[in-house]
Amino acid sequence: EGVWLCLPDSTIGEEGRMDEIRLALRELKVQTVQECRLLDARCSLPELSVGLDEYQDLTDLIYDGNDLGYVLQEQGQGEPRFLEKFRSALEYEQCHDLKLALDIASNLNCYDYCPASDVERFGEEVLQKQGETVFRDPVLQGGIDLKAYGEAQLEQQGYLLNTAETGYIRR
């Protein structure tokens, strides 16, 4: 009745077709993707859904799915907390479709992200940048709630806390 196509497919065959696709075509006993029809599509990110009517051409869906698969596999070329930042950006943009997710992924550098675990450090850095003498005065050092200060500064600077409360993001 059908086959699942797992993406990304990192191996390209001599004829320019991906190995995963070649296997699917052979299993379905067809020559091209155009001879197939999409029955269902799923994404490993629960916040994204792929509408069956979103793509006119199945080939475009396969390429976009493959591209997103590469993005997730590469994790922003080792960028720390890539997936947290990416998922927060998806939420920030209220993104639920594949095409917009690819756009966000390719422009992820346009977003600033601060993990919730770093809020205290963020507050401390803001104070240091402002040249506050708090850190040189032992009496004042213990009197500042750096976590509360950091949260207030993040909100003042336009950051939004994601619904999982794991990080703050802004564009």
Language-model features: locations:
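Mixed-charge (acidic/basic) macromolecular-recognition segments
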Residues: 18-137
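Short, extreme N-terminal segment that most often corresponds to the first beta-strand
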Residues: 1-11, 168-171
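Short linear, low-complexity motifs centered on an aromatic residue
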Residues: 13-34, 157-170
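Acidic, proline/glycine-rich low-complexity IDRs
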Residues: 121-171
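Residues in flexible loops and secondary-structure boundaries
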Residues: 13-15, 46, 152
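Generic structural motif
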Residues: 8-12, 41, 149
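Generic detection of long, well-ordered alpha-helical segments
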Residues: 11, 15, 140-143
